[in-house]
A protein has these predicted regions:
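Membrane-interface capping segments at transmembrane-helix boundaries
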Residues: 66-73, 247-261
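Juxtamembrane helix-loop-helix connectors linking adjacent transmembrane helices
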Residues: 37-45, 72-142, 160
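Membrane-interface helix/loop boundary segments of multi-pass membrane proteins
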Residues: 145-170, 197-204
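Interfacial transmembrane-helix boundary/kink motif in multi-pass membrane proteins
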Residues: 1-18, 44-48, 69-101, 160, ...
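Hydrophobic alpha-helical transmembrane segments
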Residues: 6-14, 48-57, 85-90, 125-145, 232-237, ...
Length: 261
């Protein structure tokens, strides 16, 4: 039985990689070869194809998530409530503040400067730089798909054969590595740890999704906002680091009290 759970994380990540690339290829061929839409026009509105792809991915992985854990529906789960929703957003904002400090450090290290440039270029190219497309893809769709995959499937499968701390750490490292950029991998892994702790303690996917949502929302705003607004955003997310740490530590303490009962 444990061998089955050992294989699930590897297979799920591989499925996401293969399916997303296959869907991108099919959409591109459909638009260019079947509908004969000019490539320049396709690139301008390519975010609609990406939104469609993410909709399919959400459907596939949410269905897989439900099928995997259908027999554990009675497992204790924290109901959605305002306090934990707000706490999850605070954690996301705080993680973004820590990410900002890490990126500032990485920019000063010659060995990481190319990774920073590649990461920034990739962020700018999301949805062709379209604000609506970026919001729908990076802020809404990506957090849903990635949290279902890495917290709902990968982390939860690992909990069947490893202790909580190991499952959270390993799934977070895999989440970081999956971004294929060393600078992005570090802060993605850090966010994964915070999201993993909330999921482990609450067993409600909404909370890590909100962490991811808040983090990506700030990143998007920083990409589109004027420099004056960016300065205010930077101050805000730095201030949020301490409250974020408090929320995560409180979740850990609550978990210990529950475990001792």
């Amino acid at each position: 039985m444990k061998k089955r759970y050992f294989a699930i994380p590897i297979l799920a990540i591989a499925l996401h990689f293969l399916l997303s690339n296959l869907l991108y290829f099919l959409v591109e061929r459909l638009v260019l070869d079947v509908f004969h839409i000019p490539s320049q026009q396709f690139m301008k509105h390519s975010y609609w194809g990406e939104i469609l792809i993410y909709a399919v991915l959400i459907l596939v992985f949410f269905t897989l998530y439900k099928l995997l854990w259908r027999k554990e529906i009675s497992e204790p789960r924290t109901a959605t409530n305002f306090k934990d929703v707000l706490g999850s957003l605070v954690v996301g904002f705080g993680i973004c503040g820590i990410s900002g400090l890490w990126i500032m450090l990485a920019e000063q290290l010659p060995s990481l400067q190319k990774s920073v440039e590649a990461m920034n270029a990739g962020t700018e190219n999301i949805a062709g730089g379209n604000a609506f497309g970026t919001f729908m893809i990076a802020v809404i769709a990506a957090p849903v798909v990635e949290e279902i995959l890495f917290r709902g499937i990968v982390l939860r499968s690992m909990r069947k054969f490893t202790p909580a701390w190991a499952a959270i750490l390993i799934s977070s490292v895999l989440f970081g590595v999956y971004h294929l950029n060393i600078v992005q991998a570090v802060y993605a892994a850090f966010m994964g740890i915070a999201a993993g702790i909330l999921y482990e303690k609450k067993r409600n996917l909404l909370f890590p999704i909100l962490v991811h949502f808040a983090n990506n929302l700030i990143t998007m705003l920083q990409g589109f906002a004027p420099s004056e607004v960016n300065e205010l955003i930077s101050i805000f997310i730095l201030i949020m680091i301490a409250p974020a740490g408090y929320v995560v530590c409180r979740s850990l303490r609550q978990g210990k009290r529950a475990d001792s009962m």
